[in-house]
Amino acid sequence: MPNAERILSSFPKVRPELPEAYRAIYAEHYRRNREGLSPASSLSQKMEAWMHRRVARDAAERKTPSRTLEIGAGNLNHVLYEPDSEIYDVVEALIELPEKSPRRHRIRHAYRTIDEIQNEKYDRIVSIAVFEHFCDLPVTVAKCGLLLASGGQMRIGIPSEGTILWRIGWGLTTGMEFRARHGLNYSVLMRHEHVNTAKEIEGVLRFFFRDVRREVLGLMPALSFYQFFECREPDFQRCQGVFDRTR
């Protein structure tokens, strides 16, 4: 699997530093983007609903309650798409977001990092528009594989980062709005935020999972806005090997 090995060799990555002008407005931009306070971010949230619906689709079809873990849960927007679970845990580096969310009662535990989770197994691990941000993505995916219960699945949605349609999409919406508001080039912020392309994410998923299925919002992966992956049958030897090499 030379292509997968080549992709894995590019990790861990180093996130590009933001220039001072971007750091000065980053927190406010992040808040407005999260809350959909601008026309562009509001439109983006409507488009992202496709990912939320795909990720949650299996939960509505389950006949028994499930144990679910969400990676990068933010302020718990995704739980609006999920039926009640037996257990719903989340991982969020900005722990104050889920803790202060009006939907906090829907979850059991909130962790800052996935490494805090011990002695747990989940039927479902879900994530929406998060994996493109992780500088050490293979470690996160390997840990997810080890946390899955027998017959479990990981379901993730990602933007089609690295494709022309995705570039045109944000360039004509958020990019134009960002330049009008701040006089700055949005691509600098995107390079800081999105360190992984959709192709790289797919490569990592296929390395650690034997059964990976994909759907796209678009004509094909190379001409799409978003992608959804359903991952089953983790290769436990490969997943564990990531952590054995770091000991």
Model-assigned labels for residue ranges:
Residues 53-166, 228-236:
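Conserved SAM-binding loop
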Residues 2-28, 32-45, 49, 114, ...:
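S-adenosyl-L-methionine-dependent methyltransferase catalytic module, highlighting the catalytic core
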